[in-house]
Amino acid sequence: MYYKTGDVCRKIINVDGFDFQLRVKKRVYSVEMVVLDHEGNSIDGLLVSDENDLYTALDILKQSVYEWIENNTDEQDKLMNLVMKW
């Protein structure tokens, strides 16, 4: 196999100008997906065992990220992101 059990991959994802980290860990019969905030705190995580689970998990994680943005940012944060897109 390409990935060994226990291998962890990380990727920066950007949602509405805010950076988050996606951490994916291979387990014996599943893959663990965890989204972390800019300080490394877990926002949400799920276990995925097949491709159908993946699409559901991505929707759930995306909703968790939007909730985090709503609860942890203010209008000035959002305005700064709009300015930085320029």
Question: Model segments located where?
Answer:
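Mixed-charge, Lys/Arg-enriched low-complexity segments
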Residues: 2-3, 38-86
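Amphipathic, interaction-prone secondary-structure segments
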Residues: 4-36
